[in-house]
From Swiss-Prot:
Basic and acidic residues biased stretches: 1-22
Name by which UniProt lists this protein: Catalase
Amino acids binding NADP(+): H194, S201, R203, N213, K237, W303, H305, K306
Modified residues (N6-acetyllysine): K233, K306, K449, K480
Residues where Phosphoserine is found: S9, S417, S434, S517
Location of this chain's protein in the cell: Peroxisome matrix
Any single Gene Ontology cellular-component annotation: mitochondrion
Gene Ontology BP annotations: aerobic respiration; cellular detoxification of hydrogen peroxide; cellular response to growth factor stimulus; cholesterol metabolic process; hemoglobin metabolic process; hydrogen peroxide catabolic process; kidney development; negative regulation of apoptotic process
Family in the record: Belongs to the catalase family.
The reaction(s) this protein catalyses: 2 H2O2 = O2 + 2 H2O
Gene: Cat
Source species of the chain: Rattus norvegicus (Rat)
């Protein structure tokens, strides 16, 4: 019944009711000129041609032609919300960041949840990691914690990131999702085993956005007021409890309600059922990092909680839906290099790569002045620098202040207290190969100790159901990697693949050639 619809379905009705006492606004052009007729174009006679002087039409159509901005190359499908972060435990011994200044302090936040590989209109219930990015609007500028719903990732070296994403996207010729591409990359990069195993476990399809954890994933550095530093990892655990979707239910929702996660989040907040997450850190001293049994900056591994327990810090609460999706979610831009004093990057190779990649793609997608867009603006800090001009400069461009540094005219000065913590690095400069670092020990622990028997069974079924569509030689490479983790892991997946492979094969298209250039060259030669 229409009377029992959810808040998302009734958005238009509620908007009208909120404006009930007001008269409708006067319809205008983009330039603010009142419009007398919005239904009929201006023509020379009832059957004549359109007149170029019909600026009502040209203003509308020209803007419509430019409505779309470039889609995010990853994390294109997403949902956003706003709220606050509240400190519940003192960690000033670790960090001088103002966001952690005292117990009870609240900092405004913006959060975006997303899938990774799908396009903007893709389903929310696919098996894919979820982005879980948090923007803290602090007095020292924005802090963007650009995380996922998994504590690990597929790769540990940023050089592989473009190829990894290409393998998860569409085939360059068929424009279809291609299991050959997906599993060829994963099987050739065994460092992906930890994340692949997590992805095909029950947690690979969260029940919406409210029932999953978030992780900063990378290793970061915290610096206190005395200049003392430690390494840390960030965790945010859902207070709603972990809930995942069975494969069949996820498939049904993908067809019947592909925006399931977006709808669930909007309706929960609109109904006053504000989702929250408890925020924790793990801490490791520099001395501990030197003797750690593996690289503490390796994004494919976790820090054991028994050795580095979770330290409670605060709570994330989401209590406001976006007023306009495009303005506040599609234009939202997260940048891992946005770190206020007290929070710094570690040598994590993936984090180091993201420090460049994220602001670079935002400048492409939103323009060089994307930080002036209201949702991205560090509105609780006063931005004062020597950056000027550029497309879509929306403020006063810092008026008549000098645009060079140093200068003698009382323009912005550097602040010594904001200097980064000193770091020590190896003097050896080369491309260090990390591909053969231990890729199986933590995966074995996850498989044998974290998952129970039923969960292991579903894991192997999920993998085989996806891997079966790849070519046999790729299947064999993948199974070898699973066997390296644990013989039972590989044997179960292989047994299921044998069942699939014994059935009549489906028609498959495998087109990995560079024929186009050869054909073109041959054609030119025959001219």
């Amino acid at each position: 019944m229409a009377d029992s619809r959810d808040p998302a379905s009734d958005q238009m009705k509620q908007w009208k009711e909120q404006r009930a006492p007001q008269k409708p606004d006067v319809l205008t052009t983009g330039g603010g000129n009142p419009i007398g007729d919005k239904l009929n174009i201006m023509t020379a006679g009832p059957r004549g041609p359109l007149l170029v002087q019909d600026v009502v039409f040209t203003d509308e159509m020209a803007h419509f032609d430019r409505e779309r901005i470039p889609e995010r190359v990853v994390h294109a499908k997403g949902a956003g919300a706003f709220g606050y972060f509240e400190v519940t435990h003192d960690i000033t011994r670790y960090s001088k960041a103002k966001v952690f200044e005292h117990i009870g302090k609240r900092t405004p936040i913006a959060v975006r949840f997303s899938t990774v590989a799908g396009e903007s209109g893709s389903a929310d219930t696919v098996r894919d990691p979820r982005g879980f990015a948090v923007k803290f609007y602090t007095e020292d500028g924005n802090w963007d914690l650009v995380g996922n719903n998994t504590p690990i990732f597929f790769i540990r070296d940023a050089m592989l990131f473009p190829s990894f994403i290409h393998s998860q996207k569409r085939n360059p010729q068929t424009h279809l999702k291609d299991p050959d591409m997906v599993w060829d990359f994963w099987s050739l990069c065994p460092e992906s085993l930890h994340q692949v195993t997590f992805l095909f476990s029950d947690r690979g399809i969260p029940d919406g956005h409210r029932h999953m954890n978030g992780y900063g994933s990378h290793t970061f550095k915290l610096v206190n007021a005395n200049g003392e530093a430690v390494y840390c990892k960030f965790h945010y655990k859902t207070d709603q409890g972990i809930k995942n979707l069975p494969v069949e239910e996820a498939g049904r929702l993908a067809q019947e309600d592909p925006d399931y996660g977006l709808r669930d989040l909007f309706n929960a907040i609109a109904s006053g059922n504000y989702p929250s997450w408890t925020f924790y850190i793990q801490v490791m001293t520099f001395k501990e990092a030197e003797t750690f049994p593996f690289n503490p900056f390796d994004l494919t591994k976790v820090w054991p909680h028994k050795d580095y327990p979770l330290i409670p810090v605060g709570k994330l609460v989401l209590n406001r839906n976006p007023a306009n999706y495009f303005a506040e979610v599609e234009q939202m831009a997260f940048d891992p290099s946005n770190m206020p004093p007290g929070i710094e990057p570690s040598p994590d190779k993936m984090l180091q790569g993201r420090l460049f990649a994220y602001p670079d793609t935002h400048r492409h997608r939103l323009g060089p002045n994307y930080l002036q867009i209201p949702v991205n603006c560090p509105y609780r800090a006063r931005v004062a620098n020597y950056q000027r001009d550029g497309p879509m400069c929306m403020h006063d461009n810092q008026g008549g202040a000098p645009n060079y540094y140093p200068n003698s005219f009382s323009a912005p000065e550097q602040q010594g207290s904001a200097l980064e913590h000193h770091s020590q690095c190896s003097a050896d400069v080369k491309r260090f190969n990390s591909a053969n670092e231990d890729n199986v020990t933590q995966v074995r622990t996850f498989y044998t100790k974290v998952l129970n028997e039923e969960e292991r069974k579903r894991l192997c079924e999920n993998i085989a159901n996806h891997l079966k569509d790849a070519q046999l030689f790729i299947q064999r490479k993948a199974v070898k990697n699973f066997t390296d983790v644990h013989p039972d892991y590989g044997a179960r997946v292989q047994a299921l693949l044998d069942q699939y492979n014994s059935q009549k094969p489906k028609n498959a298209i495998h087109t990995y050639v560079q024929a186009g250039s050869h054909i073109a060259a041959k054609g030119k030669a025959n001219l």
